[in-house]
UniProtKB/Swiss-Prot annotation:
Gene Ontology MF term list: rRNA binding; structural constituent of ribosome
Entry protein name: Large ribosomal subunit protein uL22
Native organism: Prochlorococcus marinus subsp. pastoris (strain CCMP1986 / NIES-2087 / MED4)
GO biological process: translation
Gene3D superfamilies: Ribosomal protein L22/L17
Amino acid sequence: MTKTPEMTKTAIAHGKYIRGSASKVRRVLDQIRGKSYRDALIMLEFMPYRSTDPITKVLRSAVANAEHNLGMDPSSLVISSASADNGPVMKRFRPRAQGRAFSIKKQTCHISISVESAPNQTNTEAQN
C-alpha cells in the first residue's frame, strides 16, 4: 500500500513596486532561502544592504498570513521560495552642459516570499 504525500500548506506574500534593483534584492534573497523564519530575521537584521528593510516587511507579512489564515505556528516556518522580479522603470533626465540630458533609470522590483511549515523531525525518525 502506498501512502499519498500530505499537502503542505503554503502562505505567500508579495511586495510590489519596491524601489531598488531586482538583482540587488536577489543577492539577499539567495542567502535566506531555505532558512527558518527566526534565522532569516536575524540574518536580515545584520546584513549591510538597503534592500533588507522591504524584504523583512514582506517576510513578516508572509508569516502573518500563515499564522492568521492557516493557523500555523511561526516558530516552525521555513522560507520555501523567495524571488524578485523586475518592475517598471521610472525614467528621469538630468540636465547637462550645452543642452544635453543624461537619462536616469530608477529601478523597481516585485518581491515574492512563501513560507511553509518545516517537516517534523519526530515523524521522520519514527518512519525509519
